[in-house]
């Protein structure tokens, strides 16, 4: 792609990371190109679209195909500087006429998932093409058909070669989206390292669990703590939330959309931050307070002579090992404080909270 297809950062002097385009934006541009070729016999290249917030990006076509009664166009997704697993994937739209009066029908082609569970924005049995991309494609197809005096009765099939393999790196399998990736996007723009997409996936996970009648969900900070909790509960995949560092994303959504029981599992350092009151546990946005750990250790019986060693410790794990070496448990009090943070954030929502603290090997240090 050339510079025409690269989203401009709103303040180039301050922003160093490059934005990209969503799969939904790519699918919309590919659909516009395919429908135009189906009607006129010629592919617009580059092809421009209007995004929901008014941006007008242009995309070069990576693939063109024109046959009897159908047209295909493909665009390589550029996610900018975001570590998006779909970066470099080819988003292909195949368009052909549908029977009169049917309107626009969306189908999942190779590498695009199909929804199988309740609770998502798209009902079971439908292609995993989210509402905003559907609306963008519908509007652009209706406009083109109106321009040529044609009815907007079309079948649009979106395909992503290799999408089934890419989907294994996403939470689609746990959400009950099988066979490939989802076609996503609300603005059309991918903002590098944005938290919003991750938090959105947490919310959709809770929606799916609620729709399935699941009474117990698990949010873990990483795979080690997740495995430790799963060894206890063996919850179904759709009951495991993509929490990571975003404890607040889980708790605030459960506050309005409660599930009977929540288990939060995490390493000692991450849950120390939660115990301190932090809801974003990422190292760039919250840090372990050694003074807080000393207060916990002192209440647990640590001698005054240990204070300086704790305050000067390099990591939370070093503090844990220091206290363990003299037989003092600080993981239990940390779990209790973390639970209090969770309950405070839930603001009385009917959710029972359990905290599991693990070490780096997945051994359970505390469970309250």
Swiss-Prot record:
Q: Keyword Transferase, does the record have it?
A: yes
EC top class, in one word? transferase
What's the domain of life for this entry? Bacteria
EC numbers on record? 2.1.1.195
The record's annotation in InterPro entries points to: CbiD (IPR002748), CbiD_sf (IPR036074)
Q: Which GO terms describe its molecular function?
A: cobalt-precorrin-5B C1-methyltransferase activity
Q: In which pathway does it act?
A: Cofactor biosynthesis; adenosylcobalamin biosynthesis; cob(II)yrinate a,c-diamide from sirohydrochlorin (anaerobic route): step 6/10
Keyword Nucleotide-binding among UniProt keywords: no
Alphabetic keyword roster: Cobalamin biosynthesis, Methyltransferase, S-adenosyl-L-methionine, Transferase
UniProt catalytic activity = Co-precorrin-5B + S-adenosyl-L-methionine = Co-precorrin-6A + S-adenosyl-L-homocysteine
Xref: Gene3D superfamilies: CbiD-like
Kindly name one Pfam family recorded for this protein: CbiD
- Please name the GO terms of the biological process aspect recorded for this protein, alphabetically: anaerobic cobalamin biosynthetic process; methylation
Write out the similarity annotation: Belongs to the CbiD family.
Its recorded name reads Cobalt-precorrin-5B C(1)-methyltransferase
